[in-house]
């Protein structure tokens, strides 16, 4: 919108605004202004956002990022990031900040030499007012210096597209950073550096065997990825996957656009009913209290936070804790597993008790979402 919004506003003022505005060039995000946070009530938000870069150097068949933002990451200058952090701080924001990049580590050199050192200095000067989280490819695990800098800057969580434990499916979708890799070891290494891994998983690839649903469950449980976002493969318009399926006459007239409702917009090789049934089984299993709480324990055994900030517990957090204890500890069917985890955390990992409770509460939400899948 950096390039076309001024054109729209000019036409709007003249009373001749068009329905669609397009640009042939990628916008220069070095010209992106600092958001006017004063336009919203910051107290109504649990986290807020900053964007450092756009674009991703990889070309996965199902992904439309390179269509929307290109495959050559474009970044802001460190002065822009500092200015945006200042703006949030001056508005009184304290808490989570999500770097909403397509792939935060798309330009590692600049990130390590300029951007992260600037964030580290800023956050130390301000006494660690924020915790950061972002999205990155699995090859983050290959760069210990980068993981160390992210931890020092205050990053404590990262979303990673795992997609599938099936090597043939990774080859099929051209998921280059995931191929020929011990994905389980990579996840545990990232978490060892104090970065909680949230994982994205996909079922429905042509190369998926019928055993893929069990394989996904097994991998998720062993990895300790507490927040495992499993979806059915979708073919967004203009992607290479969309074009291939169109040529194979496998596209369906329309799709919901929601890859977590069990539906898709093409005819899968394993059959639509088999895929939908298997997907629901995966989601129901991984978010059942027993399996979900076991993953929290696995995660906490691996997790070694390195940042200097402390998890701050607010009055709202305490109220949520009391309410959740009543619902999860007394009313829910899986309450025995709840109390086992609470006792285990207090005995084995007491310093992680606030984090454990936060993950427990999130799990309740995930179960409610899973129940809506038909």
Model regions: which residues?
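Basic phosphate/pyrophosphate-binding loop/patch that engages nucleotide-derived ligands
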Residues: 9-17, 218-227
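Radical SAM enzyme core and accessory elements
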Residues: 12, 250-253, 259-374
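Core catalytic loop region at the nicotinamide-binding pocket of NAD(P)H-dependent oxidoreductases
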Residues: 15-20, 95-97, 293
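Glycine-rich beta-alpha loop elements in corrinoid/cobalamin-binding modules
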Residues: 1-30, 238
């Amino acid at each position: 919108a950096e390039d076309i919004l001024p054109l729209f506003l000019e036409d709007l003022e003249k009373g001749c605004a068009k329905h669609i505005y397009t640009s042939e060039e990628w916008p220069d995000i070095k010209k992106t202004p600092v958001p006017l946070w004063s336009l919203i009530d910051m107290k109504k938000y649990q986290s807020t956002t900053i964007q450092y870069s756009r674009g991703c150097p990889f070309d996965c068949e199902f992904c439309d990022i390179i269509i929307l933002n290109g495959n050559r990451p474009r970044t802001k200058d460190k002065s822009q990031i500092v200015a945006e952090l200042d703006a949030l701080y001056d508005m009184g924001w304290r808490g989570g900040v999500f770097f909403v990049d397509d792939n935060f580590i798309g330009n590692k050199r600049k990130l390590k030499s300029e951007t992260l050192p600037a964030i580290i200095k800023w956050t130390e000067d301000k006494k660690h007012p924020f915790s950061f989280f972002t999205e990155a490819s699995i090859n983050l695990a290959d760069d210990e210096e980068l993981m160390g800098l992210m931890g020092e800057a205050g990053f404590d969580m990262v979303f990673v597209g795992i997609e599938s434990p099936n090597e043939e499916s990774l080859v099929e979708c051209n998921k280059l950073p995931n191929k020929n890799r011990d994905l389980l070891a990579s996840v545990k290494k990232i978490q060892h550096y104090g970065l909680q891994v949230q994982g994205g998983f996909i079922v429905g690839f042509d190369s998926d065997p019928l055993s893929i649903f069990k394989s996904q469950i097994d991998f998720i449980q062993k990895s300790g990825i507490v927040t495992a976002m499993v979806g059915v493969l979708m073919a967004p318009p203009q992607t290479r996957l969309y074009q291939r399926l169109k040529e194979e006459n496998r596209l369906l007239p329309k799709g919901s656009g929601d890859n977590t409702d069990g539906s898709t917009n093409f005819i899968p090789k394993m059959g639509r009913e088999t895929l939908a049934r298997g997907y629901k089984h995966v989601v129901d299993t991984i978010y059942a209290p027993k399996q979900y709480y076991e993953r929290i324990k696995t995660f906490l055994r691996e997790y070694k936070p390195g940042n200097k900030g402390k998890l701050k517990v607010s009055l709202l957090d305490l109220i949520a804790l009391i309410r959740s204890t009543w619902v999860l500890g007394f009313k829910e069917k899986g309450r025995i597993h709840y109390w086992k985890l609470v006792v285990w955390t207090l005995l084995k990992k007491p310093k992680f008790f606030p984090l454990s409770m936060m993950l427990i509460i999130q799990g309740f939400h995930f179960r409610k979402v899973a129940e809506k899948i038909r």
